[in-house]
Regions:
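Residue-level recognition of tetratricopeptide repeat
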Residues: 42, 76, 111, 149, ...
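Generic helix N-cap/helix-start motif at coil->alpha-helix transitions
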Residues: 29-37, 64-71, 98-108, 121, ...
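Alpha-helical adaptor scaffolds
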Residues: 79, 179, 338, 342-345, ...
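Terminal, low-structured helical/coil segments at or just beyond the last alpha-helical repeat
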Residues: 255-257, 261-265, 510, 515, ...
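Sec-dependent signal peptide recognition
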Residues: 3-11
Length: 561
């Protein structure tokens, strides 16, 4: 409460010192209620409670013509609440046009112009937006890329003198060629999808869409047939399902290269993903809502909104977004069920979450392997290893020995056996996994760690750990393992170097903190050791068995030390 009061006082000082809205110039234009609502809105806005922020901003709309900061926040809040059309109207209907001079305002006006097929206006607004190109990291990319798109839409050709933004520009060129019906469009799709500099698998959907739109059905079937349900994204799994069931028209219902709004919508979705990857979920949702405004038919993109809200623990909003996914599109419906189960786990615990998921799963007549895989992972995370093993076994028996997915499933099942103490079965699965994929750092790490804990094949375990570390030297779990290996052979100085790094990378991991405490104790740094053991007790996800052991160590120290 005190912090909120400080924020209000600071905001008041700024507010009265703003030339556009000074006390002497315009204090009589509003009343104390406007001020109260405005500053309440600021507090809600700063606390990322956008729904409340918008409620307070709506109650003080008299300020939209008088205070630049207010207008920016009000417009931003409107878009976050998916009221894009209202946000556009607020900007367009301002008496004072000077206070609409900010980046998001121009992007909204561009979106409005595209919606109305007014490419000339869109170009004018994009030119204006460039004055803010250095204000935020992605502003230049957004303005320049939109400029290239609008040029193609307006002039029916590709802009020759343009800025290059690497692979982002390759994506833009691909869609521009698709829109202009260039003969080499297919080659651009193939080159992008096979690009080794990143994961561009999403664009397989758009390639299939392009093939269907151009009546190349057999080629579309061939591409879809190469997709594996179990390791494909939701969008690609749904695409393969549509192809297998002859639902070719579904593709054009949600996207068409002939529609400029659909193309720009996809670009804005890409921007949203960029922000989401940096944990900037508000800006991600801002651009995602603009994307949805231009192409409301691509409801599958709302899965990113649901993920963003989930990461912010806004579960009520997640539930609302999930209502967009129904049983007709089975993979997105399954995404909905999983996300609902995850929220139940967060709110009520694993037992209730697993019960909900298994009940929904059992009602599915012919569950896909991807669904079986997901429920197996849920059971494994819930420490219900027997159930997890049963589901993993169902999938493993259906896969070829050459399949990389079989290697991964054997690794997961082997880990489940290890947790149950069935080391013979665990070793069998993990070794089988490594025969398929000898360079899998995680399988190497898991098996080596298990052997070290059992004081079994120490030299071979060390060799496996060194191989895993060479492949994944920045992975904190592998760093922890190799550090713990040195601990187990009494090389505490070397062990400390690795565990210190692991703690720096995973400061809230109970096992890593526990290990580091043990090593510090052996190095006679006992005060520091107890500090890290106490850390373990402060973590919400620390197992009860670990807590009991830590409490003993804090009192008695390490035995035999």
């Amino acid at each position: 409460m005190f912090n909120k009061l400080i924020k209000i006082l600071v905001a008041l000082v700024i507010f009265y010192q703003t030339p556009v809205y000074s006390k002497s110039a315009s204090f009589n234009d509003f009343n104390s209620r406007d001020l109260t609502n405005y500053f309440s809105g600021i507090i809600a806005y700063e606390n990322k409670d956008n729904t409340d922020a918008l409620k307070f901003f709506n109650a003080s709309k008299v300020l939209t013509n008088k205070h630049d900061i207010y207008l920016k926040r009000y417009v931003y809040s409107l878009v976050l609440e998916n009221k894009v059309a209202q946000a556009i109207n607020v900007i367009k209907n301002r008496n004072n046009k000077d206070n609409t001079d900010f980046f998001n305002a121009y992007i909204l006006l561009v979106v409005d112009s595209l919606k109305k097929n007014d490419f000339k206006k869109a170009e004018e607004y994009l030119t204006q937006s460039l004055k803010f190109k250095n204000q935020r990291r992605f502003n230049l990319i957004i303005s320049e890329t939109l400029k290239q798109y609008v040029y193609s839409f307006k002039n029916k050709k590709i802009l020759s003198n343009k800025q290059n933004f690497g692979n982002l520009s390759l994506i833009s060129q691909m869609f521009q060629r698709c829109y202009l019906k260039k003969s080499n469009t297919g080659s651009f799709f193939v080159n992008l999808i096979n690009n080794q500099q990143g994961d561009y698998s999403r664009y397989i959907f758009f390639y299939i869409n392009y093939l269907i739109e151009n009546k190349k059905i057999e080629k579309a079937k061939e591409i879809a047939g190469q997709l594996e349900y179990i390791n494909s994204t939701l969008l690609l799994s749904q695409s393969r399902s549509w192809i297998e069931n002859g639902k070719f028209k579904e593709f054009n219902k949600i996207f068409s290269c002939n529609n400029h709004n659909d193309i720009v919508s996809e670009f804005l979705f890409l921007v949203s993903n960029l922000y989401s990857s940096q944990d900037d979920f508000e800006n991600s949702n801002f651009y995602l809502n603009l994307s949805n405004y231009l192409n409301p038919n691509f409801t599958f993109n709302l899965s990113l909104v649901a993920e963003n809200f989930y990461m912010n623990k806004e579960y009520t909003k997640v539930k609302e977004v999930l209502k967009n996914f129904n049983k007709e599109d089975e993979f997105y419906y399954w995404f909905r069920v999983k996300k609902e189960a995850q929220m139940i786990i967060k709110e009520d615990g694993y037992e209730d979450g697993i019960d909900y998921l298994s009940t929904k799963f059992n009602k599915i007549k012919n569950p896909n392997l991807k669904m079986v895989f997901d429920i197996a992972n849920f059971y494994k995370n819930a420490k219900k290893y027997e159930e997890a093993i049963d589901y993993y076994t169902q999938i493993i028996s259906s896969l070829s020995d050459k399949s990389d997915m079989k290697s991964d499933l054997l690794y997961r099942r082997g880990g489940s056996y290890e947790r149950m103490g069935n080391y013979e079965k665990s070793d069998e699965d993990l070794l089988h996994s490594l025969r398929i994929n000898p360079d899998d750092a995680y399988a190497l790490n898991y098996l080596a760690y298990s052997w070290l804990e059992r004081d079994y094949k120490i030299d071979e375990a060390f060799q496996m750990l060194e191989k895993a570390y060479a492949a994944k030297s920045e992975d904190p779990y592998i760093i922890d393992s190799i550090g713990w290996a040195y601990y187990l052979i009494d090389n505490y100085v070397e062990a400390e170097k690795y565990l210190k790094r692991a703690v720096e990378l995973m400061p809230e991991d109970p096992i890593v903190n526990d290990h580091y405490g043990d090593i510090l104790w052996k190095l006679n740094r006992k005060i520091q050791a107890r500090y890290f053991w106490n850390n373990v007790l402060s973590f919400d996800d620390t197992d009860e068995d670990i807590r009991k052991n830590i409490n003993i160590k804090i009192i008695e120290g390490l035995k035999n030390s």
